[in-house]
Amino acid sequence: MARCRRHSRSRSRSRNQCQRRRRRHYNRRRTYRRSRRHSRRRRVRRRGCSCRRCSRRRRRRC
């Protein structure tokens, strides 16, 4: 009987770990996607001008 009880306990623990792992992975993916967007925006700003004329010609200087 003791063995049975121990087995059920370990089973539930492993299930919880799996859920935690999955949740952590999802959060990591989400943050990575968000950071990528921000970095792209910053690059555009660093280049220089962002007015309509320059954006149409694909030139970042005014």
Curated annotation (Swiss-Prot):
Gene: PRM1
Record's GO cellular component terms: nucleosome; nucleus
Origin species: Planigale gilesi
Predominant cellular place of this UniProt entry's protein: nucleus
Family: Belongs to the protamine P1 family.
Known function: Protamines substitute for histones in the chromatin of sperm during the haploid phase of spermatogenesis. They compact sperm DNA into a highly condensed, stable and inactive complex.
Alphabetized UniProt keyword annotations: Chromosome, Developmental protein, Differentiation, DNA condensation, DNA-binding, Nucleosome core, Nucleus, Spermatogenesis
Keyword Nucleus in annotation: yes
Compartments reported by the entry: Nucleus; Chromosome
Name of the protein described by the UniProt record: Sperm protamine P1
A GO term, aspect molecular function: DNA binding
Keyword DNA-binding in record: yes
GO biological process: cell differentiation; chromosome condensation; spermatogenesis
Tissues/organs with expression: Testis.
Region called Disordered, residue ranges: 1-46
